[in-house]
Amino acid sequence: MVRFQVKRQVNIDASRGARLREALDILERIVNSKSFRLRVLEHSAYTWNEGLTNEQILNRLIWGQPTPPLGALAVPRLVFFDYELVQRPIWKKLSSVRGWRIPETNDIYTYVDAFDSMSPSELASHLGHEVVGHLAGEFDHPSRKGPERDASVPYVIDDFIEELAEKLPLDEAA
């Protein structure tokens, strides 16, 4: 089991904080579900997977390494991150980018306009890309749009979370 916790929130008022908590609850339910695990294990072609098998990818997403540590099933893994909402610069007003993570840090940023326009399920999907794919799993992807980026672990995970969020409630635990 994996749990997600924001260590430091910046520019997040009570209303946005409630939506963030709701999105993280959705994300945890999805990532810890049998449905999510099956989707990860059954996916046919990840790119930028560092040569790992689907089972190793799943273990890295959930446990932080390709092989679960001894006794891992008894203790949930906690993934901490700092989360900040930032204003979108005027020259990026037409960009579809919702947010980003600075590599090798726990810092995740989301544009305010993107945050405000997302439902809790959409926010869970966005956070899944940043938190599960990048931070928890430590996977990367090409910076330019294209089939290789779309098939990378963070983007595929984002799609799985978005798909499963539409099917909530997921009442089965993995």
Q: Positions of the model-derived regions?
A:
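Walker B catalytic acidic pair
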Residues: 130
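Predominantly extracellular/secreted Zn2+-dependent metalloproteases
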Residues: 1-124, 134-174
